[in-house]
């Protein structure tokens, strides 16, 4: 990992995340409570960004990480260990930073991955973009994930899109995270930036595109499928975007991958 990126990541994890979430909860929601979990540190990235195939990988960008329901294994396997490591780091134990980075790098290989979330994406990647892989092996060197807002919440509906677009380039924590995003993109050089949901779409369009992404016919009208190009911190990247995966009328599911992939092939 580039030393500049490593230093930026450490400084980000040393931030007072409780103060950051208190502030963000007020400014990212019209109700003065965006629902961000104040006791949980942010996650800057997910996946082995050092092992990515430069120019032949995907960066999945979503809105923010989901806080699991009570009793879910992630509380014991991922979240509480992360809280302990960051507490050690902020107490002066710099070795905890290396341990924490390993947990993020090995997320998909250490048995803690939330495959219920990542399989629907990995399925499409393996079937249509990185065909030598399967839906899980694709995360080893061809895909990693980040979020626009790197703080957990149970329900992202309280996060106001317009406020996020305003704050992502002005709030000190979100601005720092955008610098990390740019550095990771520069290091991994993904062949596609995959935007899952309108929050990520609006942020990328506002900050990194010359204009709106191009909607793709009927798929664009119903599922928000749109393509385009962005430049993040000086690194050009093609953008593949759609409404958030889900179960609503306007939310795509894994059955839409073949049509999405055909549209992408035609566009590129």
Cite the ranges covered by each PLM segment.
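Active-site and ligand/interface coordination hotspots across diverse enzymes
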Residues: 1-114, 174-180, 184, 232, ...
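Charged, often glycine-rich, active-site loop that binds/positions anionic groups
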Residues: 141-173
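A structural signal for short, well-ordered beta-strand segments and their strand-loop junctions
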Residues: 58-62, 137-147, 192-197, 241
